[in-house]
């Protein structure tokens, strides 16, 4: 049995040490949990340019990716890659694709690229693994269901990392056009550059518009405005 004074000092020391580390551990654990929950709310924005929309024969020729938080703030810009495809496939594209991909310089860039589809998937998968937890963050974009079809087929490991749900800005657009036609007239118009990174940036800006002008304000924001208005009325009176 420990002697009184020595024992009490040792016990106090052990207890104090554990108490301090225990509290710090709780704080660090809480911070880690909050960070994990925050990361789970992120959105994985993707845009593809393809040789066409036929999933049986067409291929991905450009892909870009951005990560935003739940408030649509851009947190990270991922790879923006042009993927090599055979000239025969490019020559068989529709007139629309030949015109727009030719005008944007994408066709020429594809011919000059040395990046394979497998290399591209590895780059994008590495990026989203660094930025998002597995299986929790949804794919986001404009008419992103079309992109998803190609990603499911050609980049299955990338898609396996994401949540099965998607956030499609075009759905919000169509609802806004029907339910809020006056506000819809002020929605940002797409420049139609038909380049992946530009299209993602436009999609994020468009959803920001709908959020700010169509979706109702958060309760806390409403309360703040009510308080501010009340203070202003007191000042005026």
From Swiss-Prot:
This is Oligoribonuclease, mitochondrial. The modification Phosphoserine is found at residue 92. SMART domains: EXOIII (SM00479). The keyword Hydrolase applies. It comes from the Eukaryota. Belongs to the oligoribonuclease family. GO terms for cellular component: cytoplasm; focal adhesion; mitochondrial intermembrane space; mitochondrial matrix; mitochondrion; nucleolus; nucleus. Mg(2+) 2 binds at residues 47, 147. Its cofactor is Mn(2+); Mg(2+). It comes from Homo sapiens. Changing residue 215 to A: Disruption of homodimerization and loss of 3'-to-5'exoribonuclease activity. GO terms for molecular function: 3'-5' exonuclease activity; 3'-5'-DNA exonuclease activity; 3'-5'-RNA exonuclease activity; magnesium ion binding; nucleic acid binding. 3'-to-5'exoribonuclease that preferentially degrades DNA and RNA oligonucleotides composed of only two nucleotides. Binds and degrades longer oligonucleotides with a lower affinity. Plays dual roles in mitochondria, scavenging nanoRNAs (small RNA oligonucleotides of <5 nucleotides) that are produced by the degradosome and clearing short RNAs that are generated by RNA processing. Essential for correct initiation of mitochondrial transcription, degrading mitochondrial RNA dinucleotides to prevent RNA-primed transcription at non-canonical sites in the mitochondrial genome. Residues 43-207 form the Exonuclease domain. Residues 1-25 form a transit peptide.
């Amino acid at each position: 049995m420990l002697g009184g004074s020595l024992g009490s000092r040792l016990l106090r020391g052990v207890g104090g040490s554990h108490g301090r580390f225990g509290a710090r551990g709780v704080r660090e654990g809480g911070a880690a949990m909050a960070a994990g929950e925050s990361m789970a709310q992120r959105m994985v924005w993707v845009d593809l340019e393809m040789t066409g929309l036929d999933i049986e024969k067409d291929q991905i020729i450009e892909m870009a990716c951005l990560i935003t938080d739940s408030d649509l703030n851009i947190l990270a810009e991922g790879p923006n890659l042009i993927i090599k495809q055979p000239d025969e496939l490019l020559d068989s594209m529709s007139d629309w694709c030949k015109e727009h991909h030719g005008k944007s310089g994408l066709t020429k860039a594809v011919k000059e690229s040395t990046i394979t589809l497998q290399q591209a998937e590895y780059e994008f998968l590495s990026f989203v693994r660094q930025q998002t937890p597995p299986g929790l963050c949804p794919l986001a974009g404009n008419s992103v269901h079309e992109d998803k079809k190609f990603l499911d087929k050609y980049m299955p490991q990338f898609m396996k990392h994401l949540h099965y749900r998607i956030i499609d800005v075009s759905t919000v657009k169509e609802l806004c056009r029907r339910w809020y036609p006056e506000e819809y007239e002020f929605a940002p118009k797409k420049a139609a550059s038909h380049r992946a990174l530009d299209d993602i940036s436009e999609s994020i800006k468009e959803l920001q518009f709908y959020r700010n002008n169509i979706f109702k304000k958060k309760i806390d924001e409403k309360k703040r405005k009510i308080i501010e208005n009340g203070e202003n009325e007191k000042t005026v009176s």
